[in-house]
Structure formats: C-alpha cells, structure tokens
Amino acid sequence: MDVRCLISPNLLNSKIKVSGNTHHLPFSSLSKKHQASSPIQAAINGGGSSKTVKRLITLSPSEGKWNGNWKTQYDVSLRDLQLQDLVEDGPPNSRVSVDLSVQRHASMGLSVDGRIMTSIARKCSICSSLYPRLIDTSFTVWILPSSRENRASTLPEIGGDDPSVIYVRPGYEANLDSLVQDTIRLTTYAKDICSDSCEKSEPTLHYVGQTNTASVDKRWSRLLELKKK
C-alpha cells in the first residue's frame, strides 16, 4: 500500500536529525480540525453532553428574519411528546397539531398564542366505555430575552413562579415541549367523560377478574406504588 507522510517545512530547515525509523501515517488517519459548536447546538446537546435531547417545538426571540406577526405549525405525535401513556386503547401514535401565532414586541420579546388539537382513545371515567377524547385547547406564553449574566448553566431559564414566561439568553431557543405536554395532560384529565348523559349520572362500578380482588385504575398506579414505599 502506498503511504505518504507530511513533514513540516520548519523541520526540513532545522538541524534536527530525522530518524530513519519515522512512522508514516496515511492521509486517512489524519484528524480534521474540530469546529466549535454554536450556542444553540450546545443547548440542544445539553451543554456538551454526549446524549442529544430531541427538541420538537422551539422558538428563538433573537430570530432576525421575522418581523411583526407570523404563524407556524408543528405536526408531531403523542409518542414524540412522550404522552403515549394517555392512550388507553388503540395505537399510541395519534397526531398532534400545534399552531403558534407569534407576535414580536419591540425591545421585549415574543408573545405566543398556541392552539393544540388531537384525539386520544380514552375510557370514560363514569361508564368505562372507550371513546375518542377530542383535545382542542389553547395556551399563551411570553418568550423574553434574559438579562442575567450567569453563564454556568447552559439551559434556557424558566420564568420562576410564572409558567407563562420563558427567559432565554441570546443565541438560545425556547423549548415549548414541556408546556405542550402539560397542557395536553391537564386537559385530558380535566373532563374525562364520553357524553353529557354520563356527566349527569353517577359513576358505575365494574368488577375486573375475581369479585374479591380490588382493581386499580392504571392512571393512579404510580400513586399506589409511592404509597407502598
């Protein structure tokens, strides 16, 4: 195999004797110069962590090409949002449509009005019948540039006691995934009833398995595990 090596011109002009047993490296083994990651890449990678965090719904307050108002849409799935546990029967990969109406405010940031639409296969909390739980809900959030100088943390800052405000340092993006996840989960459990007639009636007890064995709704199984510890 033909092998080549690189020798510095400074080495040729010096008086240092080069050993005849010099190991030659093929060009394929020469490493390329690594480029520094951008701040956004660093945030996505968790500040240098080898595990990449996949973000789905993001907005940047420093995006310069947008002015005034604009709209954007995201098409994801319950599995993408890690909400497949909400599905009680059927495929756990229902589509989720997230529409964002964004307005830029001079020297402030972005105000975002979001709308979430999806359908989840659920069991009625009254009659236990399967039904499609239609989700059509909205949220509002402000994305503001952060003025803090704390560089120790590489993740965007969340707005303290106000969950409707997200502070983001220059060069970073606001991650709206958790906001969308919480909105869907709370809306799903808020009124888990299949019809108006069930809403006006009393809950019905259904026996599962042996009549002397208590059954636990899987939605509360995690609370039961914590109680037993």
Curated annotation (Swiss-Prot):
Transit peptide: 1-42
The organism's place on the tree of life at top rank: Eukaryota
UniProt-annotated location(s): Plastid, Chloroplast
GO biological processes: ribosome biogenesis
Residues spanning the signal sequence: none
Stored InterPro entries: YceD, YceD_plant
Keyword entries, A-Z: Chloroplast, Plastid, Ribosome biogenesis, Transit peptide
Pfam families: YceD
Primary residence: plastid
Family: Belongs to the DUF177 domain family.
Reported function: May play a role in synthesis, processing and/or stability of 23S rRNA.
Name of the protein described by the UniProt record: Large ribosomal RNA subunit accumulation protein YCED homolog 2, chloroplastic
Species whose genome carries this gene: Arabidopsis thaliana
